[in-house]
Amino acid sequence: MFVLNKFFTNSHYKKIVPVVLLSCATLIGCSNSNTQSESNKQTNQTNQVKQENKRNHAFAKLEKEYNAKLGIYALDTSTNQTVAYHADDRFAFASTSKSLAVGALLRQNSIEALDERITYTRKDLSNYNPITEKHVDTGMTLKELADASVRYSDSTAHNLILKKLGGPSAFEKILREMGDTVTNSERFEPELNEVNPGETHDTSTPKAIAKTLQSFTLGTVLPSEKRELLVDWMKRNTTGDKLIRAGVPKGWEVADKTGAGSYGTRNDIAIIWPPNKKPIVLSILSNHDKEDAEYDDTLIADATKIVLETLKVTNK
């Protein structure tokens, strides 16, 4: 007993007690910190679920209003936040594939090679030829065909580009080499626009087509000079004013490619530049139950507004 009393009254005890107390305080502090961290994590997860439910409800409400099915994928490259709704479901890609085919053309050819003149006859004209029908006698360069395909959705221009690539299967092979294992290309215009429910030819998913568009326009698949060409053509697209462009605030830049087909298919894929911010990648695909259904461009514009509201992207 004498030894213990001596120990607790000597300098050793005076040194040990503060250390023990500090250790206990540290453990308690860590425990509280971990508990707080876990609580914050659970709160964030709960808020995220609530936000997703609210967003999905808004998209479902649009689907009911327009009697359509929506497929959406968006990526805000400044925050890496995504918006996904039926993002892995297949939809007919229709003419949105024209931007990807031009991207593939740029990948396979030098800038100088785009000056090659391609000749064709009236028998080669497809169902929609606002530019190519004017140049049957002279032909058009690959660069001119790319411009016509992306900016005017000229179907003959698209077919000639596909032939230059080696056909739809060769185009698909290029996409596979880029890592797109989803997008299926099997036919030329105008047949590629006719896709029945359950068929997978000439289809993609909102997520896959958005990722591939991102690779061509913002990634390293193409050197900067070629990326700039594709983006410039898409920014000057003449067919998209009532779709994604109509859903973004004034002053925002949009580079897009539209598409339409059977079953009321209406699509738009785009890169969006809010002022002084990094771009947003967005794909909106849609269709209806009936083969002869008509589409409504406002559906795409309204869906765009919900996406931007979800991403909380402002005009500031």
From Swiss-Prot:
Secretion signal span: 1-29
Lipidation (N-palmitoyl cysteine): C30
Places the protein is found: Cell membrane
Main location: membrane
Class of enzymatic activity (EC top level): hydrolase
E.C. number: 3.5.2.6
GO MF: beta-lactamase activity
Pfam family, one: Beta-lactamase2
Record region (Disordered): 34-53
UniProt entry keywords in alphabetical sequence: Antibiotic resistance, Cell membrane, Hydrolase, Lipoprotein, Membrane, Palmitate, Signal
SUPFAM superfamilies per UniProt: beta-lactamase/transpeptidase-like
Binding-site residues, substrate: K257, T258, G259
Keyword flag Hydrolase: yes
One of the protein's GO biological processes: beta-lactam antibiotic catabolic process
InterPro entries registered for this protein in UniProt: Beta-lactam/transpept-like, Beta-lactam_cat, Beta-lactam_class-A, Beta-lactam_class-A_AS
Low complexity composition bias: residue spans: 40-50
Membrane topology reported for the UniProt record: Lipid-anchor
Catalysed reactions, semicolon-separated: a beta-lactam + H2O = a substituted beta-amino acid
Keyword check for S-adenosyl-L-methionine: no
PANTHER family documented for this protein: BETA-LACTAMASE (PTHR35333), BETA-LACTAMASE-TYPE TRANSPEPTIDASE FOLD CONTAINING PROTEIN (PTHR35333:SF3)
Additional remarks: The class A beta-lactamase family has a specific amino-acid numbering system, sometimes called Ambler or ABL numbering and often misspelt as Amber. A multiple sequence alignment was used to derive a consensus sequence and then the consensus was numbered taking into account insertions and deletions. This allows use of identical numbers, e.g. for active site residues, despite differences in protein length. UniProt always uses natural numbering of residues, hence there appear to be differences in numbering between this entry and some papers.
Family: Belongs to the class-A beta-lactamase family.
Stated name of the protein: Beta-lactamase 3
Name of encoding gene: blaZ
